[in-house]
UniProtKB/Swiss-Prot annotation:
Protein name: N-succinylarginine dihydrolase
EC number in record: 3.5.3.23
Keyword Ribosomal protein among record annotations: no
Binding partners and assembly: Homodimer.
């Protein structure tokens, strides 16, 4: 049976704004208080989706979450009508209003960790919602994510959905942004690589400036839930030094597809041992690791972070080669572009680059890889996915028109308290659930 790596990209939400909420994410803090353009942000994401779908890649769409999250504010003691809640929090806790209005669910690489059926003992695709414990504005996503994913992957014969791990420091889990899969054909067993920033119950190397968001204990728990074979699972510590330079998730410093791992030389602690372990486990599957390690002398960690070179999408092509999807910022940086130009002109597996303008997302700290959740599916599983979320030319037009109808073209912090913005969002999302055939997935629809 054939297998596919399907990308499910997040639609940017109507409250996309620059609040600097993500300590450790340097783009987020750098652009705090800038004016955003939610309409442009959504269209930039849709254009990337369409371009990849036009190339023949399977492409799905995941909806944004309801924001501002009025229900969260009520749990925190705000009361009265929705308008009164917004007014009260804007006056007395403005940073809290910004947090509950974040459109960060667009970065679906953090929605969940996904293991294909070929790797799971029960032969089903497993999803574990990420608790995103380290950041409040992200942690509040888990409840709705746990409703959205079963609305898309809605067949118990093929899909297993696990709720988020307990939201405690010991079990901080950031989802697929700290997870890679290395092997051959998508439908065949592969090695699952979990990357963590620190150990919660043991001493060890940790960053000193920025937080390590993912724990080894969380990664191990997800692997157990997904019924993975320990012989085909590796747990790797990210280099604390690069976390302190703004590499808040592993997908800011590494990306993989099939048997190719593209990463910075400083990405991992004990890198030589890590690569030896992966090679050994891949050999058990009769696969050979192709390790593309970018030297610090050619591309510094600082340049990798500012351009999101590794927050790219590595896509397998029909001719056996690979395509690298990069943000415009990578082309604009002389040293990064020089490296990439030499890379694709060589005899390695990556022979093509596609550049996308994703500046609205990039300024908040999310590149091409952040915007997508990779889900490996075989033919039967792909047929079991809610077909209305799969991007077609007609759906692209419908979603573009939907964005034009509902999204504002500029947004500042003061706009978040506007009750009209809340109503605009609910009207738009209610319509979107009908377009994508999701059912009542949002709190306002269920209440």
């Amino acid at each position: 049976m054939a297998g596919y790596e399907v990308n499910f990209d997040g639609l940017v939400g109507l409250t996309h704004h620059y609040a600097g909420l993500s300590f450790g994410n340097e783009a987020s803090t750098t652009h705090q208080n800038h004016t955003s353009n939610p309409r442009l942000a959504a269209k930039q994401g849709l254009l990337k989706m369409k371009a990849l779908a036009d190339l023949g890649y399977k492409q799905g769409v995941l909806p944004p979450q309801e924001r501002p999250a009025i229900g969260v504010l009520r749990k925190l003691g705000f009361s009265g009508s929705d308008e009164q809640v917004l007014s009260d929090v804007a006056r007395n806790a403005p940073r809290l209003l910004s947090a509950v209005s974040s459109a960060s669910s667009m970065w679906t690489a953090n929605a969940a960790t996904v293991s294909p059926s070929a790797d799971s003992a029960d032969g089903r695709v497993h999803f574990t919602v990420a608790n995103l414990h380290n950041k409040f504005h992200r942690a509040i996503e888990a409840e709705t994510t746990a409703v959205l994913l079963p609305a898309v992957f809605n067949n118990h014969r093929h899909f297993v959905h696990h709720n988020a791990l307990p939201s405690v420091t010991l079990l901080g889990d950031e989802g697929a942004a700290n997870h890679n899969r290395l092997g051959g054909e998508y439908a065949s067993p592969a090695i699952q690589m979990f990357v963590y920033g620190r150990q919660g119950m043991e001493s060890g190397a940790v960053p000193g400036r920025y937080p390590a968001r993912q724990t080894r204990e969380a990664s191990q728990a997800v692997a157990r839930l997904h019924q993975l074979d320990p012989k085909r699972t590796v747990f790797v510590q990210q280099n604390p030094a690069v976390i302190d330079q703004g590499v808040f998730h592993n997908d800011v410093i590494a990306v993989s597809n099939r048997n190719v791992l593209f990463h910075h030389e400083l990405a991992f602690l004990s890198s030589t041992q890590v690569m030896d372990d992966i090679r050994c486990k891949m050999a058990g599957l009769e696969q050979q690791l192709v390790n593309i390690e970018v030297p610090e002398a050619e591309v510094s960690v600082a340049d990798a972070v500012s351009t999101y070179l590794f927050n790219s999408q590595l896509l397998h092509k029909a001719n056996g080669k690979m395509l690298l999807v990069i943000p415009q910022e990578s082309q604009d940086n002389p040293s990064v572009w020089r490296y990439l130009s030499e890379l694709v002109s060589g005899d390695g597996p990556i022979d093509e680059l596609r550049v996308f303008d994703l500046r609205e997302s990039m300024r908040n700290g999310g590149g091409p890889a952040c915007l997508r959740l990779r889900v490996v599916l075989n033919d039967a599983e792909l047929q079991a996915v809610n077909s209305r979320v799969m991007l077609t030319p007609a759906l692209f037009v419908t979603l573009n028109n939907w964005v034009d109808q509902h999204y504002r073209d500029h947004l500042q912090f003061k706009d978040l308290a506007d009750p009209h913005l809340l109503q605009e969002g609910r009207q738009a999302l209610d319509e979107l659930t009908r377009i994508l055939n999701l059912g009542p997935v949002y709190p306002f629809q269920r209440n």
